[in-house]
Curated annotation (Swiss-Prot):
Quaternary assembly: Heterohexamer; disulfide linked. Contains 2 sets of 3 non-identical chains (alpha, beta and gamma). The 2 heterotrimers are in head to head conformation with the N-termini in a small central domain.
UniProt keyword terms in alphabetical order: Adaptive immunity, Blood coagulation, Coiled coil, Disulfide bond, Hemostasis, Immunity, Innate immunity, Secreted
PTM comment: Conversion of fibrinogen to fibrin is triggered by thrombin, which cleaves fibrinopeptides A and B from alpha and beta chains, and thus exposes the N-terminal polymerization sites responsible for the formation of the soft clot. The soft clot is converted into the hard clot by factor XIIIA which catalyzes the epsilon-(gamma-glutamyl)lysine cross-linking between gamma chains (stronger) and between alpha chains (weaker) of different monomers.
GO biological process, one term: blood coagulation
Subcellular location: Secreted
Designated name of the protein: Fibrinogen alpha chain
UniProt function note: Cleaved by the protease thrombin to yield monomers which, together with fibrinogen beta (FGB) and fibrinogen gamma (FGG), polymerize to form an insoluble fibrin matrix. Fibrin has a major function in hemostasis as one of the primary components of blood clots. In addition, functions during the early stages of wound repair to stabilize the lesion and guide cell migration during re-epithelialization. Was originally thought to be essential for platelet aggregation, based on in vitro studies using anticoagulated blood.
Organism: Hylobates lar (Lar gibbon)
Domain writeup: A long coiled coil structure formed by 3 polypeptide chains connects the central nodule to the C-terminal domains (distal nodules). The long C-terminal ends of the alpha chains fold back, contributing a fourth strand to the coiled coil structure.
Organism lineage: Eukaryota, Metazoa, Chordata, Craniata, Vertebrata
GO CC aspect terms: extracellular region
């Protein structure tokens, strides 16, 4: 989710 990699589709943590 909020990983900052590619799980931006979960909540918005990933920018890429």
């Amino acid at each position: 989710a909020d990983t900052g990699e590619g799980e931006f589709l979960a909540e918005g943590g990933g920018v890429r």
